A protein has these predicted regions:
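Positively charged n-region of N-terminal signal peptides that target proteins for export
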Residues: 1-4
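N-terminal signal peptide c-region/cleavage motif recognized by signal peptidases
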Residues: 13-15
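Short N-terminal segments immediately surrounding and downstream of signal-peptide cleavage
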Residues: 20-35
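Short beta-strand motif characteristic of blades in beta-propeller domains
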Residues: 33-41, 82-88
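Primarily extracytoplasmic ectodomains and periplasmic/lumenal surface modules that are beta-strand-rich
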Residues: 45-46, 92
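Tandem-repeat architecture and repeat-register "anchor" residues
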Residues: 49-52, 96
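Trp- and S/T/G-rich repeat-edge/linker motifs of beta-rich repeat architectures
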Residues: 53-68, 102-113
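Short, solvent-exposed interaction modules
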Residues: 61-98
Length: 113
Protein backbone atom coordinates (compact mmCIF):
# COMPACT_ATOMS: atom_id res chain seq x y z
CA UNK A 1 0.00 0.00 0.00
CA UNK A 2 1.36 3.43 -0.91
CA UNK A 3 2.16 5.72 2.06
CA UNK A 4 -0.21 8.45 0.86
CA UNK A 5 -3.15 6.03 0.61
CA UNK A 6 -2.28 4.56 4.02
CA UNK A 7 -2.16 8.04 5.59
CA UNK A 8 -5.52 8.90 4.01
CA UNK A 9 -7.14 5.75 5.41
CA UNK A 10 -5.77 6.45 8.89
CA UNK A 11 -6.44 10.22 9.00
CA UNK A 12 -9.94 10.22 7.50
CA UNK A 13 -11.62 8.52 10.51
CA UNK A 14 -9.68 10.79 12.87
CA UNK A 15 -10.97 13.88 11.03
CA UNK A 16 -14.52 12.52 11.12
CA UNK A 17 -14.31 11.99 14.89
CA UNK A 18 -12.94 15.51 15.37
CA UNK A 19 -15.79 17.00 13.32
CA UNK A 20 -18.40 14.97 15.18
CA UNK A 21 -17.04 16.08 18.56
CA UNK A 22 -17.19 19.80 17.81
CA UNK A 23 -17.79 21.50 21.16
CA UNK A 24 -19.42 20.32 24.35
CA UNK A 25 -22.83 18.74 24.76
CA UNK A 26 -25.83 18.98 27.07
CA UNK A 27 -29.46 17.97 26.91
CA UNK A 28 -32.95 18.25 28.33
CA UNK A 29 -35.48 15.51 28.96
CA UNK A 30 -38.91 15.54 27.37
CA UNK A 31 -42.21 15.27 29.21
CA UNK A 32 -42.43 11.82 30.75
CA UNK A 33 -38.63 11.59 31.00
CA UNK A 34 -38.42 8.79 28.39
CA UNK A 35 -36.57 10.84 25.76
CA UNK A 36 -33.85 13.46 25.81
CA UNK A 37 -32.82 16.11 23.31
CA UNK A 38 -29.06 16.74 23.17
CA UNK A 39 -27.29 19.75 21.68
CA UNK A 40 -23.78 20.36 20.42
CA UNK A 41 -22.80 23.70 22.01
CA UNK A 42 -20.16 24.32 19.34
CA UNK A 43 -22.29 24.10 16.18
CA UNK A 44 -25.96 24.00 17.33
CA UNK A 45 -26.82 20.56 15.94
CA UNK A 46 -29.44 18.61 17.91
CA UNK A 47 -30.42 14.96 18.22
CA UNK A 48 -33.10 12.98 20.05
CA UNK A 49 -32.41 9.87 22.15
CA UNK A 50 -35.00 7.56 23.72
CA UNK A 51 -35.27 4.14 25.30
CA UNK A 52 -37.79 1.42 25.91
CA UNK A 53 -37.25 -0.41 29.17
CA UNK A 54 -34.41 -0.36 31.65
CA UNK A 55 -32.65 -3.34 30.09
CA UNK A 56 -32.11 -1.58 26.75
CA UNK A 57 -29.56 1.09 25.96
CA UNK A 58 -30.89 4.42 24.64
CA UNK A 59 -31.32 4.72 20.89
CA UNK A 60 -30.14 8.03 19.44
CA UNK A 61 -31.39 9.38 16.14
CA UNK A 62 -29.53 11.36 13.44
CA UNK A 63 -28.13 14.82 14.22
CA UNK A 64 -29.52 17.93 12.54
CA UNK A 65 -27.24 20.00 10.36
CA UNK A 66 -24.82 22.14 12.32
CA UNK A 67 -24.25 25.83 11.87
CA UNK A 68 -21.48 28.33 12.32
CA UNK A 69 -19.23 27.92 15.34
CA UNK A 70 -20.86 29.57 18.33
CA UNK A 71 -22.39 29.09 21.76
CA UNK A 72 -25.63 27.14 21.38
CA UNK A 73 -28.09 25.91 24.01
CA UNK A 74 -31.30 23.92 23.91
CA UNK A 75 -34.63 25.13 25.28
CA UNK A 76 -36.61 22.44 27.08
CA UNK A 77 -40.19 21.75 26.06
CA UNK A 78 -42.95 19.15 26.18
CA UNK A 79 -42.93 18.01 22.55
CA UNK A 80 -41.02 14.79 21.93
CA UNK A 81 -40.35 15.29 18.21
CA UNK A 82 -39.40 18.99 18.17
CA UNK A 83 -37.22 21.34 20.20
CA UNK A 84 -36.02 24.93 20.19
CA UNK A 85 -32.34 25.84 20.12
CA UNK A 86 -30.81 29.24 20.85
CA UNK A 87 -27.57 30.92 19.90
CA UNK A 88 -26.61 32.20 23.36
CA UNK A 89 -24.26 34.80 21.86
CA UNK A 90 -26.79 36.48 19.54
CA UNK A 91 -30.19 35.45 20.94
CA UNK A 92 -31.29 33.96 17.61
CA UNK A 93 -33.59 30.91 17.85
CA UNK A 94 -34.49 28.02 15.55
CA UNK A 95 -36.99 25.16 15.81
CA UNK A 96 -35.92 21.63 14.86
CA UNK A 97 -38.36 18.79 14.22
CA UNK A 98 -38.19 15.15 13.18
CA UNK A 99 -40.63 14.15 10.45
CA UNK A 100 -39.24 10.60 10.65
CA UNK A 101 -36.70 9.64 13.32
CA UNK A 102 -34.71 7.73 10.70
CA UNK A 103 -33.90 11.06 8.98
CA UNK A 104 -32.09 14.07 10.47
CA UNK A 105 -34.42 16.67 11.99
CA UNK A 106 -35.36 19.65 9.83
CA UNK A 107 -34.61 23.03 11.40
CA UNK A 108 -36.11 26.42 10.61
CA UNK A 109 -33.82 29.26 9.58
CA UNK A 110 -32.42 31.23 12.51
CA UNK A 111 -34.48 34.21 13.66
CA UNK A 112 -33.11 37.62 12.81
CA UNK A 113 -31.70 39.67 15.63
Amino acid sequence: MRPSVFAFLILTPIAAVAAASDGQFSGVSTKGNLSVWRVNHGNGSVSLCSFEGHKNEPQCYPWSAGGQAGNYQIIGGDDVLSTWRINASSGAVSLCEYKEVTDPPICTPWSTE
